[in-house]
Amino acid sequence: MTGMALRIDDIRELQALLADRLVRTPVVRCPGLEARYGRDTRIYAKLEFLQHTGTFKARGALSVLGSLDKAQLAAGVTAVSAGNHAIAVSFAASALGVSAKVVMTR
């Protein structure tokens, strides 16, 4: 993927990149919440906490790293985070065989 324009081929490439690296998490209805908001309300939750990293952030990290060219990947990546983003970047880098440095505050 390049720039801000998103093409259908970009989506297909990203789908292929993510398919064998992420858990296909379920989508479930939330009847308790639906009852609060009326009978015609349907509320769904995507259970991304079931991902390897425990959050949805692995999708974004894999997407960004997957968009880098070979020279950029060879240089490695750096993330500044002490939370879920750090975990996701570490996971994505490992999955793609890329060196990663995670910087955390004290």
Predicted regions and their residues:
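PLP-dependent amino-acid enzyme catalytic core
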Residues: 1-106
